[in-house]
């Protein structure tokens, strides 16, 4: 079985802080030779529903996902097809994810300025399934290094993801996963730790350019 390339944390125009079209995201994913993607929009599955429709019978597998705002920070409901309420406690959010058949993955765990859950909460109090140890949206990399250290110490499965809010950043960080190209196999492989985090940080110059252009466009 060959390793598959996956970007598990991408935002689309259904997130309030992104204007990326699903078609542009898919085009970029193909340019980056990505096999598996997940649109993980803030508190809505509208984007993930669209990408699943558009990738049926194609070369890309779309995993349903959502980034949920708990009271203490963000949590990915990876594999969740339905909305999960925001502003629940972290463990209540995780319980809802598990009840939906998904995995609870902590994005940018220690990034305090981006609602990193483990900046506010001890992971030992939570039934998490995996954490991001390579999130492409960083400035100096300290938060990623801290997450990687925790993953190794506590044997928590580690993922890489672009957290792209602009389609050109898709694939900057990614995972290589030892799985068949179907949703159930991917979820099981993550739980078993058959996944590796890879990639680089999104260029801060390009990120600043995107934020400037986005701010201008939103005022038009």
Each predicted region: which residue ranges?
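Short beta-strand/loop segments at the ligand-binding rim of alpha/beta enzyme cores
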Residues: 3, 97-105
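Charged catalytic cores and adjacent phosphate/nucleic-acid-binding surfaces used
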Residues: 1-27, 32-34, 45-52, 57-64, ...
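Aromatic-lined carbohydrate-recognition surfaces of secreted/lumenal glycan-active proteins
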Residues: 105-113
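Conserved beta-strand positions in the central sheet of alpha/beta enzyme cores
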Residues: 38-41, 105-106, 132
């Amino acid at each position: 079985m060959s390793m598959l390339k996956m970007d598990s944390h991408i935002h689309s125009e259904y997130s309030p802080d992104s204007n990326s079209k699903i078609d542009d995201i898919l085009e970029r994913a193909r340019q980056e030779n990505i096999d598996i993607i997940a649109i993980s929009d803030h508190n809505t599955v509208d984007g993930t529903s669209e990408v699943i429709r558009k990738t049926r019978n194609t070369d890309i597998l779309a995993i349903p996902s959502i980034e949920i705002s708990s009271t203490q920070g963000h949590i990915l409901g990876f594999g969740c097809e339905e909305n999960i309420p925001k502003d629940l406690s972290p463990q209540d959010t995780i319980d809802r994810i598990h009840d939906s058949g998904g995995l609870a993955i902590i994005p940018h765990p220690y990034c305090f300025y981006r609602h990193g859950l483990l900046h506010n909460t001890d992971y030992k109090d939570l039934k998490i399934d995996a954490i991001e140890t390579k999130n492409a949206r960083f400035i100096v990399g300290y938060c990623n290094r801290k997450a990687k250290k925790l993953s190794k110490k506590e044997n928590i499965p580690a993922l890489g993801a672009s957290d792209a809010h602009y389609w050109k950043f898709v694939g900057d960080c990614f995972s290589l996963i030892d799985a068949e190209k179907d949703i159930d196999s991917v979820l099981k492989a993550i739980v078993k730790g058959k996944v590796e985090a890879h990639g680089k940080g999104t260029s801060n110059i390009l990120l600043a350019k995107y934020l400037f252009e986005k701010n201008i466009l939103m005022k038009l």
